[in-house]
């Protein structure tokens, strides 16, 4: 993952009577190295070989294009979209929790290359300096989920990114997900979900702040 600063944008707001107030917003371009490393033609050939090795006939009307579809599908699952992580100065001095609940999560278990899906609850206690554009919390979740993953690492990567780039007083991330490597194969534990959490700063050290975060996520304890 690469974060490229793209400068400060000054945006005038308000036009009634007095001089316009100016808000300085900062944007960080976030890209992922794998976006340029995918060889679809090679992936299609490999998919065809895999299906053939599994005894699947790829020469029927229904399966003739399956290797190409597989290659495109997996490419989409491991290619996050670049985005601008826009932050704004915390001019209002807001010091309470900012929480986005039930952000959709879809990723690939790196052990079996089978999907896991669920929701992420992501929150932070702003510093006096910066707050993040609300939609960017979902973008950050997508960014780290679009690659072969394990849920534990995904949870900590989201929290660490926020902690590094926002310098907040606290960060909390909880992910609830169902893993098809558990529901479709092996133990076949249909309906089982896995919950992981990472708490940093005040949300880790202060029991009341931690309890408030957990309560607001709606996680059943």
Q: Model segments located where?
A:
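A domain-level signal for the structural core that forms small-molecule/cofactor-binding pockets
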Residues: 1-221
């Amino acid at each position: 993952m690469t974060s490229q600063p793209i400068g400060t944008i000054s945006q005038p707001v308000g036009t009634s009577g007095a001089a316009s107030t100016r808000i300085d917003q900062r944007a960080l371009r976030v890209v992922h190295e794998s976006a340029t490393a995918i060889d679809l033609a090679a992936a299609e050939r490999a998919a065809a070989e895999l299906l053939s090795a599994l005894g699947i006939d790829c020469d029927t009307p229904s399966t003739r294009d399956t290797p190409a579809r597989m290659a495109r599908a997996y490419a989409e699952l491991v290619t996050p979209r670049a985005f601008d992580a826009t932050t704004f100065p915390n001019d209002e001095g807001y010091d309470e929790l900012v929480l986005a609940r039930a952000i959709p999560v879809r990723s690939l278990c790196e052990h079996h290359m089978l999907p896991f899906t669920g929701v992420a609850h992501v929150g932070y206690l702003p510093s006096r300096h910066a707050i993040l554009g609300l939609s960017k919390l979902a973008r950050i979740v997508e960014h780290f989920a679009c690659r072969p993953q394990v849920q534990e690492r995904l949870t900590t990567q989201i929290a660490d990114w926020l902690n590094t780039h926002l310098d907040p007083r606290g960060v909390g991330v909880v992910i609830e997900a169902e893993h098809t490597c558990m529901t479709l194969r092996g133990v076949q534990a249909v309906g089982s979900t896995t919950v992981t959490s990472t708490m940093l700063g005040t949300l880790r050290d202060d029991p009341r702040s931690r309890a408030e975060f957990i309560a607001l996520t709606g996680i059943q304890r």
